[in-house]
From Swiss-Prot:
Record has Protease as a keyword: no
Native organism: Pseudomonas putida (strain W619)
EC numbers, comma separated: 2.7.4.9
Principal EC category: transferase
Listed GO biological process terms: dTDP biosynthetic process; dTTP biosynthetic process; dUDP biosynthetic process
Heme as UniProt keyword: no
GO MF annotation terms: ATP binding; dTMP kinase activity
Protein name: Thymidylate kinase
Residues reported in the UniProt entry to bind ATP: 7-14
Length: 207
C-alpha cells in the first residue's frame, strides 16, 4: 500500500508520518519511510538544489523538472521495489505537492505537470493521501520557529495561500483517496484523528 502525507509548511507531516509508521509496525507490517524530494542519495542531492537559497533565481520549469527527476530515481530505487515486495510505503510528499507548489504556487499548468506525472509514474498513484491542513500564518510561524528558512519557506503568504487552496481542491475532487486532517490542532488531537483512520488503513493493507 502506498500512503502519502501532504500539506504546507509547518503542518507536521514528518512527525505524523513517523507516528503512523510506528502504529502500523505494532501490527506487524513492513513499513518503508521515505520523503520527497529525496529518498535516495542521488535524489537527496537534487533536494539540496531545490531547497538551498541561492543568488540565482531558479526558473519555475527548472524546478518542476528537478522535482520529477528526483521522483523518477526515487520510484526506481525505493518506492516500486518496496511496493513489489508487499511493504507499506509512507512518503512525506509526492506528486500532490507538485500540483500544489509548482502548479498552485508557481502557476505552472496542470496539463504540463500531468504529462510529466504520466511519463515518470505511469499508472502509479498513492492508494491513500493524508492532507494536513492549517492556516498559512500558523504554518509559517511553525516553520520560522524551526530556524533558518529554506528556499520555499522564504516565499510570501500569497504563494502559500495558493498552495493550500490547490491541496484543498484536489482533496475535494477525489474524496475516496484523500483524508483531510486539521493540523492546526495540538499534536495529540491530530494523532487521535490518525488513530481513527487506522482500522480502515489496516483493512486495506491486509486486503
Amino acid at each position: 500500500m502506498f500512503i502519502t502525507l501532504e500539506g504546507p509548511e509547518g503542518a507536521g507531516k514528518s512527525t505524523n508520518r513517523d507516528y503512523l509508521a510506528a502504529r502500523l509496525r505494532e501490527q506487524g507490517l513492513d513499513v518503508v519511510l521515505t520523503r520527497e524530494p529525496g529518498g535516495t542519495p542521488l535524489a537527496e542531492k537534487v533536494r539540496e538544489l531545490l531547497l538551498a537559497p541561492s543568488d540565482e533565481v531558479m526558473a519555475a520549469d527548472t524546478e518542476l523538472l528537478l522535482v520529477f527527476a528526483a521522483r523518477a530515481q526515487h520510484l526506481a530505487q525505493v518506492i516500486r521495489p518496496a511496493l513489489a515486495r508487499g511493504a507499506v510505503v509512507l512518503c512525506d510528499r509526492f506528486t500532490d505537492a507538485t500540483y500544489a507548489y509548482q502548479g498552485g504556487g508557481r502557476g505552472l499548468s496542470v496539463e504540463r505537470i500531468a504529462a510529466l506525472e504520466q511519463f515518470v509514474q505511469g499508472e502509479l498513484r498513492p492508494d491513500l493521501t493524508l492532507v494536513f491542513d492549517l492556516p498559512v500564518e500558523v504554518g509559517l510561524a511553525r516553520a520560522a520557529a524551526r530556524g533558518r528558512l529554506d528556499r520555499f519557506e522564504q516565499e510570501g503568504q500569497a504563494f502559500f495561500e495558493a498552495v493550500r487552496q490547490a491541496y484543498l481542491q484536489r482533496a475535494r475532487r477525489e474524496p475516496q483517496r484523500y483524508d483531510l486532517l486539521d493540523a492546526a490542532q495540538p499534536l495529540e488531537a491530530v494523532q487521535r484523528a490518525i488513530d481513527a483512520l487506522l482500522p480502515g488503513i489496516l483493512e486495506r493493507c491486509r486486503g
